[in-house]
From Swiss-Prot:
The lineage of its organism: Eukaryota, Metazoa, Ecdysozoa, Nematoda, Chromadorea. InterPro entries: F-box-assoc_dom_typ2 (IPR012885), F-box_dom (IPR001810). Pfam families: F-box, FBA_2. Residues 2-53 form the F-box domain. This is Uncharacterized protein F59B2.9.
């Protein structure tokens, strides 16, 4: 006996739908606009939407906050067109050659599809995903590979994204850049990996939270003074020492500045000097030696002991730090000290951070009571951190002689590694 799911009252209908995986909800949503709205009414949020159009990949996918299985729609021609026999209509587009695959081991659900206009197809699929499962959009694009960007950015749901990354080796034409930046609003992160024309100004680059430019020669002093990114990494620019002084002076007079971590890289034989800016040397009573931040999920430390210190009238400190490489490459950091003693704070929080790991060790030692004396020592949450680091190095050296660790030893090593990496920045 069959029945129409939409004939159910709204509460039991929503309860029934919530038992389904996102890919099944997506399939149901293609039945009618009413069913699509019913799926949207479940309020299943996406952690992120992605559009990837590069030389090696052309896909749309969505990841979820509370669901483990992502949905992928892949336009890459992995299978023969004649073997993709399903049809699906999304919006006004009929995809005549597609096929669904479910991969339990990889916790993802995937559609493979042949479609000639990839930009138009990606826009249609992403628009529907975003309607069903609201969440931020991230775009990765090789603009010199895909020639019909007007079909992608014509769609309003694609005209605003959380992050935009441009990749590729060729310099994009001005017309191509206009097709992107005349339509697209970027809310948080902009990364442009290829070189770009010195004559093309990307105004919204100055206002995103995170900015990464391989080529910043289009930026003038006026653009530098407008820069209000939390994090920026600019290579190959035309700035002089006097421009950096002007930037620092503006920061000194601007308490609302969002700037925290700026990195400038260029090649020159000119020594970095601050001629007119009043600076001081490092005072260990006012801040720590190292500036600590996270990059690509890894902790990074910059030694600021030889930096040029600035103090704003509200007490906020900033430091210019210069690193010079052997190949004439200069790296200049402008670092704002939001936390004056980050390592001290990190060490104070370590017991709380490491607590769950030591709890896991307790359970492992109960289930596998074959720990050695060194392993028992390392399992002690009250062990001094420096002693843990030294003891674990000794244990790792001894492991070379034991090529067949027991199950308990293998489990303990995994936790010890995590503790070691957490303690030792």
């Amino acid at each position: 006996m069959s029945f129409n799911l939409l004939d159910l009252p709204i509460v039991p209908r929503q309860k029934a739908l919530k038992y389904l995986e996102p890919i099944d909800l997506f399939e149901l949503s293609l039945c009618s606009k009413r069913m699509a709205q019913s799926v949207r009414d479940l309020k299943i949020e996406a952690s992120a939407h992605f559009i990837t159009l590069t030389r090696g990949q052309s896909s749309v996918h969505v990841q979820f906050k509370e669901r483990s299985r992502a949905i992928w729609w892949d336009f890459k021609e992995i299978f023969m067109k004649k073997d993709l026999k399903d049809k699906r209509k999304i919006g006004y587009i009929l995809f005549e050659n597609c096929e669904k695959f479910r991969r339990g081991a990889f916790t993802l659900d995937e559609f493979y599809c042949h479609f000639d206009n990839l930009e138009e197809g990606a826009a249609a699929v992403s628009k529907h995903f975003q309607f069903l499962f609201p969440g931020p959009l991230n775009i990765l694009l090789s603009p010199t590979v895909y020639r019909h960007l007007e079909f992608l950015f014509f769609e309003p749901s694609i005209q605003k994204c959380e992050s935009f990354e441009m990749c590729g080796a060729d310099i994009p034409a001005k017309r191509t850049m206009n097709r992107i930046f005349d339509k697209l609003t970027i809310e948080k992160k902009l990364c442009i990996r290829p070189k770009t024309s010195e004559n093309y100004v990307i105004k919204q680059a100055l206002r995103v939270e995170e900015l990464f430019l391989r080529s910043a020669r289009w930026m003038t002093r006026e653009h530098l003074l407008e820069l209000n990114c939390i994090v920026a990494d600019l290579s190959d620019h035309n700035f002089q020492c006097s421009d950096f002084e002007a930037f620092a002076e503006k920061w000194m007079n601007n308490k609302s500045s969002k700037v925290e971590n700026l990195r400038f890289q260029w090649q020159s034989d000119v020594e970095f000097k601050l001629e007119n800016l009043k600076t001081s040397r490092w005072d260990s009573t006012r801040r720590e030696r190292n500036y600590i931040f996270t990059m690509k999920n890894e902790s990074v430390q910059i030694d600021c002991s030889d930096g040029f210190e600035l103090e704003r009238n509200d007490g906020r400190l900033a430091t210019f730090v210069v690193e010079q490489q052997e190949d004439r490459t200069h790296i200049l950091y402008f670092l704002v000290w939001i936390e004056l003693f980050p390592e001290k704070k990190r060490l104070e929080n370590l017991p709380k951070t490491l607590g769950p790991l030591y709890k896991q060790l307790e359970k492992i030692n109960r289930d596998y009571p074959d720990e050695s004396s060194l392993e028992r020592l390392l399992s002690n949450p009250n062990l001094v951190y420096t002693e843990f680091l030294e003891t674990y190095k000794v244990l790792k050296n001894m492991d070379g002689e034991n090529r067949s660790p027991s199950t308990g030893q293998a489990f303990r090593r995994t936790i010890f590694d995590k503790i070691y990496n957490t303690i030792d920045l």
